[in-house]
Amino acid sequence: MRKHFGTDGIRGRANGIITPELALKVGQAAGVIFQRGDHRHRVVIGKDTRLSGYMIETALVAGFTSVGMDVLLLGPMPTPAVAMLTRSMRADIGVMISASHNPFEDNGIKLFGPDGFKLNDELELEIESLIDGDMRRRLAGSRDLGRAKRIESVHARYIEFAKRTLPRHVTLDGLRVVVDCANGAAYRVAPETLWELGAEVIAIGVEPDGFNINRDVGSTAPESLVQKVRELRADVGIALDGDADRVLIVDEKGQKVDGDQLMAAVARSWKEDERLTQPGLVATIMSNLGLERFINGLGLTLARTAVGDRYVLEHMREHGYNLGGEQSGHIIMSDYATTGDGLVAALQLLSVVKRRNLPVSEVCHCFEPLPQILKNVRFRSGEPLRADSVVTAIAHAKDRLGQSGRLVIRPSGTEPVIRVMAEGDDHALVAEVVDEVVDAVTRAAA
């Protein structure tokens, strides 16, 4: 049973769940586990722009150096940049201090192995066992303590990496781009990358103060970006989240393009170019049925996983896919990155736009999403989904939807909530089905 790690590292209220004491122990435990071989061991640490990042970074440095690991400090950098630099700098482990799209009061710790991939369940459980144990006998001697060093050239390294995901002949000349960096980790690298590729760049969400990350900006609050795109008559808007591992696109009309539409546009282009390593892509159970029908219409298949980019990536690696993601904008292109990379995904989409010489709206709106309704049911205890009345209601709902829709019911991984989602061609039927299941779950949870 997991105590500290969730589906995306350790996350919670800063100085509540994520305390200096916990960060110290995480550094010590991870340092002990990844000290293999007889070379000098080191860890790469990046963070987003939250005020609590300083506190957590300092505690992690103390933890890693106390067990003999050297620390390379990157400062504010996107999560995918930390994963890339972990590999590039031959580090034994990478750490990202971020709570992604959450408000500034929260923070988190994500860990990457030397290959740049997030740690598997077994390693996370091993780290948990050490966190809760006695580390005193694992500490390094006075002569063997690690050293910490701040690296200055990391922004240029990541910018060059992002640019190299495009062929050298591809530029963004002639595109007016508004980029919203959520006052987060990409506030320096994203505008600079786009400018170096030739775009006219208007940057918003690039004034972090420790408190304003994700506040009314970024991929989870794109209204200001929509307004700016329309106001400036820009060709495209790009919204990243606080750690820049997800992206949302806004077309020249101010219409939002979610992860499903983005994956559809890229999949169509990659199929034409014979770039897909498997005849399809990987998405989650929450992706719209319209995406599945569009992908099937291309002669491709859509594999579905549980919610969470780690499950998408696991399926991609196991079955050899190079494209996958989530409706929320976590897009994984494994030819380039070991995790979701919002900037790289945006660049790949813009390369399709440039090649086809069409407006973003014509490239990105590949299918009409089916009506989708999601409702949450809170419960205090027990397992309401096991109740006979709920099982019967779910079976009846699926029969009513038939082949024209889908029903997805799942417990939240972070709170006592059951999510009921249905989609289908008939909006009225979808609404009825959701209400019936919600009523049954609510009664069972009472």
UniProtKB/Swiss-Prot annotation:
Gene Ontology biological process: carbohydrate metabolic process; peptidoglycan biosynthetic process; UDP-N-acetylglucosamine biosynthetic process
Gene3D superfamilies: Alpha-D-Glucose-1,6-Bisphosphate, subunit A, domain 3, Alpha-D-phosphohexomutase, C-terminal domain
Cofactor(s) this protein cannot do without: Mg(2+)
SUPFAM superfamilies per record: Phosphoglucomutase, C-terminal domain, Phosphoglucomutase, first 3 domains
Domain of life from the UniProt record: Bacteria
Entry note: cofactor: Binds 1 Mg(2+) ion per subunit.
UniProt-listed PROSITE patterns: PGM_PMM
Post-translational modification: Activated by phosphorylation.
Residues holding Mg(2+): S100, D241, D243, D245
Class of the enzyme per the UniProt entry, highest EC level: isomerase
Reaction catalysis annotation: alpha-D-glucosamine 1-phosphate = D-glucosamine 6-phosphate
HAMAP family registered for this protein in UniProt: GlmM_B
Job of this protein: Catalyzes the conversion of glucosamine-6-phosphate to glucosamine-1-phosphate.
Protein name (record): Phosphoglucosamine mutase
Organism, as annotated: Methylorubrum populi (strain ATCC BAA-705 / NCIMB 13946 / BJ001) (Methylobacterium populi)
